[in-house]
Design a protein with these regions (language model features):
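Active-site cofactor/cluster-binding pocket
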Residues: 1-139
Length: 139
């Protein structure tokens, strides 16, 4: 999120060459706040996935042609002792419904990104990732 508006990032996961980094309609959208949901909800392809941070967003999706997961990401992060881990919890929810990356590979990517200096945060991030997956599994 960004003061006064929304921030977004497009990620294309493919085992083929990517012709263009631009995404008009997405298979998956993660909305961390209401302005992002309002702006990007219609950009999910029919049959796609919308993951909503229900800790911050109270409204429900208006779409009936997509899968919607409501992830109480902030509460999950607090519950596992990683209060800054809402983004990792919601990533776990997304991966549960759209397993584009193996959980072990994602955990390894988090470890590498944290590096030695922040290695103490790895366990909290693992817990948030798994708890987010479990929350999505129940929906």
């Amino acid at each position: 999120e960004m003061r006064g508006g929304t921030a977004n990032c497009s990620v294309i996961v493919s085992d083929k060459d990517v012709a263009s980094p631009l995404v008009d309609k997405a298979d998956v959208i993660v909305a961390m706040n209401l302005p992002s949901l309002d702006k990007f909800e219609e950009h999910v392809k029919p049959g796609g996935l919308l993951v909503i941070n229900s800790s911050i967003i109270e409204r429900k999706s208006t779409r009936d042609d997509i899968t919607v997961v409501y992830c109480d990401a902030n509460r999950i992060a607090e519950a596992v002792g990683n209060p800054k881990g809402a983004n990792v919890a919601i990533l776990g929810a997304m991966l549960e419904k759209e397993p584009i990356v193996d959980i072990d590979k994602m955990t390894e990517a988090i470890r590498i990104e944290l590096g030695e200096r922040k290695a103490r945060f790895l366990e909290g991030n693992k817990k948030a990732l798994v708890a987010g997956m479990e929350a999505a599994r129940e929906q």
